């Protein structure tokens, strides 16, 4: 790939940060340490590139990131004037943690990742950063950390997984989650239940639908912080290896031209990122994370920006969880660049935004494949959308005075009025499914699991999957002050602000109350008289904190509400 920059170029030192340590004669101990890690005399004048991966053995999304990081380090070291230094940070496997209390740590991990990238690179004076994330919170954590440092940076996505297969049926991670509901209702045999579990995940790569990881990877490529095709190159592919091999030249180009995240991550670039999320039918988590990423670079993005763009942006991608296809299928028809090329042609994107290639978004995709709407139905044209407007809707009302996020594909309708069934937490809901407490026409209310109440705002993938598997996905709605996985589908509303423990009305809902959700007029309301609400509020007792020490307690104390991205550094 060719890298360039159209702006004014001035001669700069590539090692302008690391020279603080490598060139200062009053730092002999520092320089002795460098010799200790194998530096040669000529290495002290080189720009240091920190290569951070979220590699660990315990997650298919991340198990190969160390290998990718090593390839990137080799690419950097083969590039004149650069030296690569690998480091690592943590991750949480959402697929493993979902459904249990460990899921409270997932969103927290985004902040830990950002903090550790900032901490390591800030202390070590790296001149540039390359991040290699895999699972959901890895991506925004990486971008937030790089934005805070504001040094030349590139994100290399670990890549999507291939589909699994059992008895001729294609599987993915959500197949395993939904099998639980089928098991509870007796709609799957023990043998097939085990067969789905054994075959849903065939190996390396992030969960394969348009779930949170793939959504954010596509958004970040569109934002301009990844090389073209990064988000749709499969984890196990020659294309992903080739991408790693290009990073040395790419990061040197950014260093030479002093192109920083603040030059790339503009208001218009974030609008592009939101647009691709809508077009691809992406995860509700994109709302939370794009707001947080923008905050880190000093750009104001709010929930209302999502609604504004949703109002004029159709859903064109037929991807799981609500559609048919996986991201590996998108790769076969030209990947995200082919989609961007089409959207630019139709005037849906800002084409003049700068990217990590040193070129604009429009220049990056000029040679991408053209989408052929005759030979494939993975992506539809604007005149034949899956949904005429965006699937992510921001709802307000007495149940969500600070807003909430609904994921409405259109298949489940756009209006729901039903009877509340209240659950204080995820396990309470699962118990309710198993006991037959939920029926058609009910609105499940899962509360006290917000950023503070959770703490950590865990995802409700297990409940929504159980609802689908039990055959109630089209006849029940679910609302929560928690989050949803990118794998969630159905009539669902999350991110309710204020959350229950912060005085939100969701904390006062009782069984048999009437709840109305209107995705046409963007409202969510509890149909209970004001005097009755006042009586309940007077008698309300706030639950005791679930965490009083450690990282969960710190998060609960520092976090902003979901409407502000749950950031912790304001």
Swiss-Prot record:
[2Fe-2S] cluster binds at residues 61, 135, 207. The gene is ilvD. Homodimer. The active site is at 485 (proton acceptor). Mg(2+) binds at residues 94, 136-137, 459. InterPro entries: DHAD_IlvD/Edd, Dihydro-acid_dehy_C, DihydroxyA_deHydtase, DiOHA_6PGluconate_deHydtase_CS, ILV_EDD_C, ILV_EDD_N, IlvD/EDD_N. It comes from Lactococcus lactis subsp. cremoris (strain MG1363). Disulfide bonds: none annotated. Keywords: 2Fe-2S, Amino-acid biosynthesis, Branched-chain amino acid biosynthesis, Iron, Iron-sulfur, Lyase, Magnesium, Metal-binding. The modification N6-carboxylysine is found at residue 137. It catalyses: (2R)-2,3-dihydroxy-3-methylbutanoate = 3-methyl-2-oxobutanoate + H2O; (2R,3R)-2,3-dihydroxy-3-methylpentanoate = (S)-3-methyl-2-oxopentanoate + H2O. It holds the Pfam family ILV_EDD_C. Belongs to the IlvD/Edd family. Binds 1 [2Fe-2S] cluster per subunit. This cluster acts as a Lewis acid cofactor. One of its GO terms (biological process) is L-valine biosynthetic process. Functions in the biosynthesis of branched-chain amino acids. Catalyzes the dehydration of (2R,3R)-2,3-dihydroxy-3-methylpentanoate (2,3-dihydroxy-3-methylvalerate) into 2-oxo-3-methylpentanoate (2-oxo-3-methylvalerate) and of (2R)-2,3-dihydroxy-3-methylbutanoate (2,3-dihydroxyisovalerate) into 2-oxo-3-methylbutanoate (2-oxoisovalerate), the penultimate precursor to L-isoleucine and L-valine, respectively. SUPFAM superfamilies: IlvD/EDD N-terminal domain-like, LeuD/IlvD-like. It comes from the Bacteria. The keyword DNA-binding does not apply. The lineage of its organism: Bacteria, Bacillati, Bacillota, Bacilli, Lactobacillales. It is an enzyme of class 4 (lyase). This is Dihydroxy-acid dehydratase. One of its GO terms (molecular function) is magnesium ion binding. Its cofactor is [2Fe-2S] cluster; Mg(2+). Pathway: Amino-acid biosynthesis; L-isoleucine biosynthesis; L-isoleucine from 2-oxobutanoate: step 3/4; Amino-acid biosynthesis; L-valine biosynthesis; L-valine from pyruvate: step 3/4. Its EC number is 4.2.1.9. Gene3D superfamilies: IlvD/EDD C-terminal domain-like.
């Amino acid at each position: 790939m060719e890298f360039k920059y159209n702006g004014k170029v001035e001669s700069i030192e590539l090692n302008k940060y690391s020279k603080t340590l490598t060139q200062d004669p009053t730092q002999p101990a520092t320089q002795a340490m460098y010799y200790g890690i194998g530096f040669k005399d000529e290495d002290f004048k080189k720009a240091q590139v920190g290569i951070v991966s979220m590699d660990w053995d315990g997650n298919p999304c991340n198990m190969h990131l160390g290998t990718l990081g090593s390839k990137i380090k080799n690419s950097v070291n083969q590039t004149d004037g650069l030296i690569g230094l690998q480091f690592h940070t943590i991750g949480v496997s959402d697929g493993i943690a979902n459904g249990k209390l460990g899921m409270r740590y997932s969103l927290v991990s985004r902040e830990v990742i950002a903090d550790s990238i900032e901490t390591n690179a800030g202390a070590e004076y790296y001149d540039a950063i390359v991040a290699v994330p895999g699972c959901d919170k890895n991506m925004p954590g990486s971008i937030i950390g790089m934005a805070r440092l504001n040094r030349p940076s590139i994100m290399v996505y670990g890549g999507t997984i291939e589909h699994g297969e059992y008895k001729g049926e294609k599987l993915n991670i959500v197949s395993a989650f939904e099998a639980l509901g089928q098991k509870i209702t007796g709609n799957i045999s023990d043998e097939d239940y085990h067969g789905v579990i054994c075959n849903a995940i065939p190996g390396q790569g992030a969960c394969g639908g348009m779930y949170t990881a793939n959504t954010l990877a596509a958004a970040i490529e569109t934002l301009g912080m990844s090389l073209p095709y990064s988000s749709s190159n499969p984890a196990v592919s020659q294309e992903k290896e080739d991408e790693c091999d290009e990073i040395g030249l790419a990061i040197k180009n950014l260093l030479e031209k002093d192109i920083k995240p603040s030059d790339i991550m503009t208001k218009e670039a974030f609008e592009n990122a939101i647009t691709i999320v809508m077009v691809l039918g992406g995860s509700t988590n994109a709302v939370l994370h794009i707001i947080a990423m923008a905050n880190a670079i000093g750009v104001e993005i709010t929930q209302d920006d999502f609604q504004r763009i949703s109002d004029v942006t159709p859903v064109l991608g037929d991807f799981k969880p609500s559609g048919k296809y996986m991201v590996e299928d998108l790769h076969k028809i030209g990947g995200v660049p082919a989609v961007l090329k089409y959207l630019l042609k139709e005037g849906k994107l800002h084409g003049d935004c700068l990217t990590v290639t040193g070129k604009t978004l429009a220049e990056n995709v000029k040679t991408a494949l053209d989408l052929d709407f005759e030979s494939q139905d993975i992506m539809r044209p604007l005149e034949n959308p899956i949904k005429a407007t965006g699937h992510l809707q921001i709802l307000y009302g007495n149940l969500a005075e600070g807003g909430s996020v609904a994921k409405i594909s259109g298949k489940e309708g756009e209006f729901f009025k039903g009877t509340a069934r209240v659950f204080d937490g995820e396990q309470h809901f699962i118990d309710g499914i198993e006991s037959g407490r939920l029926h058609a026409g009910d609105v499940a209310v899962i509360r006290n699991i917000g950023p503070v109440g959770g703490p950590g705002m865990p995802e409700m993938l297990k409940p929504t999957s159980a609802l689908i598997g039990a055959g109630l996905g089209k006849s029940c709605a679910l609302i929560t002050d928690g989050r949803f996985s990118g794998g969630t589908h159905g009539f669902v509303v999350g991110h309710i602000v204020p959350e229950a423990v912060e005085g939100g009305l969701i904390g006062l809902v009782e069984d048999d109350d009437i709840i109305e959700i209107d995705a046409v007029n963007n409202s969510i309301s509890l149909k209970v008289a004001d005097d009755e609400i006042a009586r309940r509020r007077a008698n309300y007792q706030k639950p005791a904190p679930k965490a009083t020490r450690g990282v969960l307690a710190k998060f609960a104390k520092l976090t902003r509400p979901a409407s502000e991205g749950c950031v912790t550094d304001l």
